[in-house]
Amino acid sequence: MYLDHFVVQNFRNLKKLDIDFDPNVNIFIGKNAQGKTNLLEAIYFLALTRSHRTNSDKELIGFGGEYTNLLGHVRKSQVDLTLRVLITQKGKKVWINRVEQAKLSKYVGQLNAILFSPEDLELIKSAPALRRRFMDQEFGQINAEYLYFASKYRQVLLQKNNYLKQLAKGKTKDQVFLDVLSDQLAGIAAEVIFRRFKFLRYLSHYASDVYAHISLGGEKLAIAYHPSVSTIEADDTVEEIYQKILANFERNKAVEMRKGTTTSGPHRDDIEFKLDGKNAHLYASQGQQRSIALSVKLAEIQLVHQLTDEYPLLLLDDVMSELDHTRQSALLNYIHGKTQTFITTTDLEGISWEIIKKPRVYHMQSGKISFEKEN
């Protein structure tokens, strides 16, 4: 799939853009704070209806504006689509081929996009919250069921935590309703965890293959999922996971009532990256950690293709300068001829032109874009 036409209205500092993209490689060059990252964020938002930089959609509306409008024409192997997202102070709406969609889950997945930024290089050594966000964003865009259950889990978790706070403050003593919420949350959590195990098995397989090609040390990469409920195992059924979570909630009821928060569940789970069985966070060098992060991103591309039969868009936000020549070449060779790629950079120095063939180069300044050349 590829995005061949994109219209942006009032997205951060991008007042009005109307762009035709090359189906292969598009490079955006400009100084910092000119709008390059904002453009990639807009493409990402068109695909996933969420930003990788903020949890507040309102922040995306340009200064002094009342709304943000994104419109994209997407070409896929079997069909062409027109996608639209409208953001206002009241919320957001989405359309597929001019038909408004009542549920975001019906929209997300029509256009797949993988974003790779310098922050992703910190995936291995960052806090668990970033790795959980990684799972929710990447798995959610390729599976509507996961997106639904992850969203529902956040809603019920908030409801349960609010009720726990009331119990902690003595504003209510009704534990029956708490049990109802715990039962509901356990059922949804089981669906989320079951799917995380499934997707991580795929991702670990592909990432291991990629790492074997781009690393020089010969180590074997593996990705392990660690539920906060330690009794849960990778081959458990949804029902078995549900029963274990529910039992854990019951054991920890007094603690949760005292603390006013849910102490276990998908919102407390984590991923571990291992090299030859050792925790990469603790034992891998910085170079090895970067190779792991790169392998995971490239594996995502293969995972999306495996599950959707389409290659996703690849958004490389100022990441080329963070990769040495070996890793940059591995990245470009892997995606060559597969994905429509968008690259932001402050200059064209150091880019492996022997791999990138005839990219379309644009210049960005103060939120405006001009077609510069095909290199």
UniProtKB/Swiss-Prot annotation:
Its main location: cytoplasm. InterPro entries: DNA-binding_RecF (IPR001238), DNA-binding_RecF_CS (IPR018078), P-loop_NTPase (IPR027417), RecF/RecN/SMC_N (IPR003395), RecF_2 (IPR042174). It is found in: Cytoplasm. This is DNA replication and repair protein RecF. GO terms for biological process: DNA replication; DNA synthesis involved in DNA repair; double-strand break repair; SOS response. Belongs to the RecF family. ATP binds at residues 30-37. The keyword DNA repair applies. PANTHER family: DNA REPLICATION AND REPAIR PROTEIN RECF. One of its GO terms (molecular function) is single-stranded DNA binding. The keyword tRNA-binding does not apply. GO terms for cellular component: cytoplasm. The RecF protein is involved in DNA metabolism; it is required for DNA replication and normal SOS inducibility. RecF binds preferentially to single-stranded, linear DNA. It also seems to bind ATP. Keywords: ATP-binding, Cytoplasm, DNA damage, DNA repair, DNA replication, DNA-binding, Nucleotide-binding, SOS response.
